[in-house]
From Swiss-Prot:
GO terms for biological process: 'de novo' pyrimidine nucleobase biosynthetic process; 'de novo' UMP biosynthetic process. Pathway: Pyrimidine metabolism; UMP biosynthesis via de novo pathway; (S)-dihydroorotate from bicarbonate: step 3/3. Homodimer. Keywords: Hydrolase, Metal-binding, Pyrimidine biosynthesis, Zinc. It comes from the Bacteria. Zn(2+) 2 binds at K100, H137, H175. Its cofactor is Zn(2+). This is Dihydroorotase. It comes from Pseudomonas fluorescens (strain ATCC BAA-477 / NRRL B-23932 / Pf-5).
Length: 348
């Protein structure tokens, strides 16, 4: 087994960078590894149109480390009030690459999200016409639905209907967490893809709940039972081009996670590709990592793959116990624990 792994530079097709004073920290972490990233728009207020996307993009570019060529790929936040004209303008601007459907109340800063998918059908028609992909947080939010069943029920009630109604619309089922989602994506047309996070490949709900509640494993969609984790590992390592890397790295300050009502999100960007390598190594599938991390996403979005490369070496190191987050701190995934792979710096 090789102790060195070289890949075309990967991209992250789902990340939260937040805004303001924390951007120099979050942008540096993603730019260390990834050439591009799909930037989630759930700020306060959200990124609703091309002008707001451009302003956020400029703040991200200004926060890049010196010499970085990292490219943020911007996303619009869909609301009940989004207009088809805003979709056409976003597509025409060249730097908006998708629009995001958050069911209202599904996750962090989603209160402005869509209350009924039927309300945005004219917007989805415009997206299909101009070729702007739809990114979906696939969970229902009704109070009578068990949190572990939100994704499965969303598929049955909404996802099937959307892809059948708009067959030419490219749809990314984001951060999938269940065997049902894997099966849905496999059976859908080539216009449907899915991102998978490192934490859903490496962990299941036992890691979060057995022996005490571990808030830094709490995310949405929530970690599921190990049978779903196995289905995700099967999909990610299968070579199926419909599945690609999306960290859903979502930082919250330490005090906001370690609280009586803690926030949802895992911060993995600081060592994302190293964590994915561990997951793929568990399946003896390191030969499939480049396709998942570097090729499948660009192909789905109609973009060229990166031409430079990164190299990982099999070398144990200890993850930091905390990281700077503006004037505060964030506790990263795997804080204080050993990682088995290390990224060689400045290999391009």
């Amino acid at each position: 087994m090789s102790d060195r792994l070289t890949l075309l530079r990967p991209d992250d097709w789902h990340i939260h960078l937040r805004d303001g004073a924390v951007l120099p920290n979050t942008v540096a972490d993603v730019a260390r590894t990834f050439g591009r990233a799909i930037i989630m728009p759930n700020l306060v207020p959200p990124v609703r149109n091309a002008a707001e996307a451009d302003a956020y993009r400029q703040r991200i570019l200004a926060a890049r480390p010196a010499g970085s060529r990292f490219e943020p790929l911007m996303v619009l936040y869909l609301t009940d009030r989004t207009q088809p004209e805003e979709i056409r303008a976003a597509k025409a601007c060249g730097f908006v690459h998708a629009a995001k459907l958050y069911p209202a109340g599904a996750t962090t800063n989603s209160d402005s999200g869509v209350t009924s998918i039927d309300k945005i059908f004219p917007v989805l028609e415009a997206m299909a016409e101009v070729g702007l992909p739809l990114l979906i947080h696939g969970e229902v939010t009704r109070g009578d639905v068990d949190v572990f069943d939100r994704e499965k029920i969303f598929i049955d009630e909404h996802m099937r209907r959307v892809v059948e109604r708009f067959p030419s619309l490219k749809v990314v089922f984001e951060h999938i967490t269940t065997a049902e989602a894997v099966q849905f994506v496999k059976e859908a047309s080539a216009n449907v893809g899915a991102t998978i996070t490192a934490h859903h490949l490496l962990y299941n709900r036992n890691h979060m709940l057995v022996g005490g509640i571990r808030p830094h494993f709490y995310c949405l969609p929530i970690l599921k039972r190990n049978t779903h984790q196995e289905a995700l590992l099967d999909a990610a390592t299968s070579g199926n081009a419909k599945f690609f890397l999306g960290t859903d790295s979502a930082p919250h300050a330490q005090h906001a996670k370690e609280a009586a009502c803690g926030c949802a999100g895992c911060y993995s960007a600081y060592a994302a590709i190293e964590l994915y390598a561990e997951a793929f190594e568990q399946r003896n599938a390191l030969d499939q990592l480049e396709a998942f991390a570097s090729l499948n996403g660009p192909r789905f979005y109609g973009l060229p793959a990166n031409t430079d490369s990164i190299t990982l070496v099999r070398e144990e190191w200890t993850a930091p116990a905390s990281l700077p987050f503006g004037e505060l701190t964030v506790i990263p995934l795997r804080a204080g624990e050993k990682l088995r792979w290390r990224l060689l710096e400045d290999h391009s």
